[in-house]
Swiss-Prot record:
It comes from Homo sapiens (Human). Residues 428-442, 484-498 have a biased composition (Basic and acidic residues). Residues 233-242 have a biased composition (Pro residues). The modification Phosphoserine is found at S461, S467, S640, S641, S773. Residues 445-459 have a biased composition (Low complexity). This is Protein kintoun. The lineage of its organism: Eukaryota, Metazoa, Chordata, Craniata, Vertebrata. The keyword Cytoplasm applies. Interacts with CFAP300. Interacts with DNAAF4. Interacts with DNAAF6/PIH1D3. Interacts with DNAI2 and HSPA1A. It holds the Pfam family PIH1_CS.
């Protein structure tokens, strides 16, 4: 900065390379340096200065202008700051050539002021001069010249001195267009700052005709160059309106806020979860304090969203609202004495880590889908093998971007997120939507028994989250016919939730590409909360900032925007007791997403239970935040009466492993005491993390049998954490998990492979002990009330392999081992490998 200021005065020289070379070689010559020193001495010689002034006065008199050189006599010096960036000094001087001060009595009644005297203070100004200070710093010096009587009065009366200093500062501001810090102006002990330079007063002589009258044509020779215009005769000055007396207030220093990001190459990988965050890592605040000598004179206080700076001498006051919440415990401040700058570095409190998607796109990464069993890619593959003709025509006409396996074609039924879609109409029969389904028919997924092919651009659709295989979720489907069709003779029922990038519902249910053109789409949204704010993450790339149209109400928030020729809109509503603050939301937009921060009303601070989300207020669905209340409610429903009716159990053992803001881990063990050969324990592990995207399945095997001794009721509760729909998974070590990943295949192929795998480890007697049936119960939602959609599944099963037969290869003896426990450092993709241990 100092180098730039030093070189600014040399930029107007405009020297060529040859001239620079000549000057360099000349100053290396000792004879040239001696002559140059003599020339400088002649310029500073007082006798030569007087001769120069006399010659200039004679030349100006010939032009009809009287010139007087005003030599400033030292008085006192005012120190202040110039434009809040660097130091400045104002020399209050005196000279007899300036007019003497005068006063006249005034009542002050017309201005509302007290009676007193109105003073007239003539002054003379000289252009500012720049000097080099210590540590290569630069400062400006201005000279304001008054009559000696004015300075004499100022030395005797303190009030008159304050008026004189205020007049000098105001004159410099008006004449040179700069901003001086009047509040922190301080009088120094020095009488003059810098080298005195004479100012010039030019007044026209009365009755003198100019050298060439107006209207006379110019001669053949050009006029002699003259740097000043001919002064005009002073006219009567109009009285200026009185200025209102301003109360002295502390000076607000200049500052700059820089957002600092750390470059991480992981954010630039070719992956769906790699994207630079719009939230910076640090905030660097640079505060200009040109009059502050040390950091001891200032008091700095930083809170979560506010920076406060106070100083008495000099008088500074700054209240800066920070754009992001910061960690005040890990911030640092440093004062640069050379530049008189206070640099404050504050680390930003990063939001909860973004959940990494656990769903692979079948079209984009087929090799990943082939390696993992039970993924969306296999569900789509099996669905395409068993698709029907009417379903293909519906997919082509409607353009839905979903892929659902049919129950009739493959023996696998894919349920909607809370409910099953109604069966399709028969061939040649047109389906008429019901009144309750008319508005949301275009958002529903494929019914059981039909398959819809994804559109070619379904992988990169903004609404679908980049997943071509999506489950449908709607509040309109609720017919009993759909439930009856889902309870056929299928051996396996699979419940899928494809969450895409953000764990949201399908593209059709969220208003994806399957919607009609011209209608707004519902964007994928993540929601996180703390006690005072709500943070919304809109996962739509390339949002146009000028298209944002928001409407904020204490009970709801509505936003409409556009991106890539698509229009998006969503409606966010909360419970009546949960209210938002009406302050303006903080919006940050990047190339990949947008972050919106909403403040909670002071009377509603704390953790909220649920929130309602949809494209408008007519199609809202309830979502739950992860908190202790919601988890306790889920455990009460899991441990309700169906367990007691089906099995004779001891009191359940519940162990809370970990409870944090981002993770809740509970271990509940249900034991049976009646039969030791049957199921000894059932462990449920609830692992709900707000920063991971999980896709969970409940898959069971069904083999014909007549014996059923026990039943276990399992409920899947959907709880939203940071806007994600996640299911509590019922993990059991029974035989139902032996066919994990094969439920998407056709029924005939699945049964043959299952029998082949089972014959390697099971006897014929153990095969007859396998029995499992799935009964799906659904809750209907009231049209006037928004409630959570809970999918309840009752599983009747018989304990599988609770003993191991070990054959000695030497003597052929067989040893039966019961209650075998094996600890493994990793989890198997297929539970059959665990049973073969």
């Amino acid at each position: 900065m100092a180098k730039a200021a030093a070189s600014s005065s040399l930029e107007d020289l405009d020297l060529s390379g040859e001239e620079v070379q000549r000057l360099t070689s000349a100053f290396q010559d000792p004879e040239f340096r001696r002559m140059f020193s003599q020339y400088a001495e002649e310029l500073t010689d007082p006798e030569n200065r007087r001769r120069y002034e006399a010659e200039i006065t004679a030349l100006e008199r010939e032009r009809g202008v009287e010139v007087r050189f005003v030599h400033p006599e030292p008085g006192h010096v005012l120190r202040t700051s110039l434009d809040g960036a660097r130091r400045c000094f104002v020399n209050v001087c005196s000279n007899a050539l300036v007019g003497a001060p005068s006063s006249r009595p005034g009542s002050g009644g017309d201005r509302g002021a007290a009676p007193g005297s109105h003073w007239s203070l003539p002054y003379s100004l000289a252009p500012g001069r720049e000097y080099a200070g210590r540590s290569s710093s630069r400062y400006m010096v201005y000279d304001v010249v008054f009559h000696p009587d004015a300075l004499a009065l100022a030395r005797r009366h303190e009030g008159f001195r304050q008026m004189l200093d205020a007049t000098a500062l105001e004159a410099v501001e008006k004449q040179f267009g700069v901003k001086l810090d009047r509040r922190n102006a301080k009088t120094l002990k020095a009488k003059y700052k810098g080298t005195p330079e004479a100012a010039v007063l030019r007044t026209p002589l009365p009755g003198v005709i100019p050298a060439r009258p107006d209207g006379e044509p110019k001669g053949p020779l050009p006029d002699f160059p003259y740097p000043y215009q001919y002064p005009a005769a002073p006219g009567p000055r109009a009285p200026s309106p009185p200025e209102a007396a301003l109360q002295p207030a502390p000076t607000e220093p200049r500052y700059s806020v820089v957002q600092r990001h750390h470059v991480d190459l992981q954010d630039y990988r070719c992956s769906r979860d790699s994207a630079p965050s719009p939230v910076p890592h640090e905030l660097v605040i640079t505060i200009e304090l040109p009059l502050l000598r040390s950091a001891e004179q200032a008091a700095l206080e930083v809170t979560r969203k506010l920076l406060c700076l106070d100083s008495r001498k000099p008088d500074y006051r700054l209240r800066l609202s920070l754009p992001y919440p910061v960690d005040d415990g890990r911030g640092k401040a440093q004062f640069n004495k050379a530049r008189r700058q206070l640099v404050v570095t504050l680390p930003v409190v990063l939001p909860a880590a973004r959940r990494e998607p656990a769903v692979a796109v079948a079209a984009a990464a087929p090799e990943e889908s082939a390696d993992r069993s039970g993924t969306d890619g296999q569900a789509c593959a099996s669905a395409r093998e068993g698709e029907a003709g009417p379903a293909r025509s519906r997919a082509e006409d409607g353009g839905h971007d979903t892929c659902v396996a049919g129950a009739a074609g493959s023996g696998v039924t894919t349920l909607g997120d809370p409910e099953v879609a109604p069966p399709p109409a028969a061939a040649g029969e047109e389906r008429v939507p019901k009144p309750g389904e008319q508005d949301l028919s275009r958002h529903a997924g494929s019914p059981p028994g039909s398959v819809e092919e994804p559109s070619p651009g379904g992988e990169n659709s903004p609404g679908g989250g980049g997943s071509p295989c999506l489950s449908s979720r709607s509040l309109a489907w609720g017919s009993s016919a759909g439930r009856e069709s889902a309870r056929g003779d299928s051996s396996v029922e699979t419940r899928e939730e494809s969450e895409g990038t953000g764990g949201q519902r399908s593209a059709c249910a969220m208003g994806g590409p399957g919607t009609k053109s011209g209608e707004p789409l519902c964007p994928p949204l993540l929601c996180n909360q703390d006690k005072e704010t709500l943070t919304l993450l809109i996962q739509v790339p390339r949002i146009q900032p000028q298209s944002l149209q928001g409407d904020l109400n204490p009970l709801w928030y509505k936003l409409r925007f556009s991106a890539q020729d698509l229009v998006y809109s969503f409606f966010l509503q909360f419970a009546p007791e949960n209210k938002l603050s009406t302050t303006e939301p903080v919006i940050s937009i990047s190339s990949n997403n947008a972050v919106i921060e909403l403040a909670k009303s002071p009377e509603s601070h704390g953790h909220w239970r649920e929130w309602y989300y949809g494209v408008n207020n007519d199609s809202l669905e309830e979502r739950l935040f992860v908190n202790e209340e919601n988890v306790n409610e889920f455990l009460e429903e899991v441990l309700s009466s169906p367990f007691k009716q089906s099995m004779s159990l001891t009191p359940p053992l519940i162990e809370v492993l970990q409870v944090t803001d981002n993770k809740i881990q509970i271990n509940a063990k249900l034991q049976e005491c009646s039969n030791s050969d049957q199921l000894q324990g059932k462990e449920e592990r609830v692992n709900e993390e707000s920063h991971l995207t999980e896709k969970e399945y409940i898959e069971h095997c069904n083999t014909p049998t007549t014996d059923s001794d026990s039943s276990i009721a399992v409920k899947a509760l959907q709880i939203d954490s940071f806007g994600l729909v996640t299911c509590f998974q019922q993990e059991s070590l029974d035989v139902s998990q032996m066919i994990l990943g094969k439920s998407q295949q056709p029924e005939s192929k699945m049964q043959s492979e299952f029998i082949k795998e089972k014959s390697a480890t099971c006897s014929n007697e153990e095969k007859d002990n396998l029995n499992e049936s799935v009964i799906t119960e659904e809750k209907e939602t009231d049209g006037d009330h928004l409630s959570s959609l809970l999918n309840k599944t009752t599983v009747h099963n018989i304990p599988g392999f609770d003993s191991i037969k070990e054959t000695n290869m030497q003597d052929g003896s067989v040893q039966v081992i019961k209650d075998h426990v094996t600890n493994c450092a990793f989890s198997f993709q297929n539970s059959l490998l665990y049973d073969l241990d």
